[in-house]
């Protein structure tokens, strides 16, 4: 059972790190696109838009947090994911569906699927106790397979969210 806990601990951290690394890369490569998305949410005052770089910096800090985490210090990643879910939900409740989420990658309109995706990612980022055992042999293989399946599942959900409004 301890091996399964280790598999979950490391693969969930790896998946959330991958999501944040992709988001940071997109925001830093295309800052104007990200700023446009921030403006679209109508949650940040104009003066706050000058500090757009704080979000990618916090996401990078969340990656580092997950990388060196003993499990109890995953609060930044969890908080950012819940913040993003709340920002999307607020705009959906306002009736605003025709805007880019600013998540990274190709343009993805906001929708309830993105809210659920971020909540699931937040659940994966929940602080937990680090496993004590060392991953060996089968445990490492299971972790890699779980991480790859999680990454594939994330990519599928992301594509479904991106396509949901286009139809």
Language-model features, listed with the residues they occupy:
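Membrane-interfacial helix-loop segments of redox and metal-homeostasis proteins
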Residues: 1-166
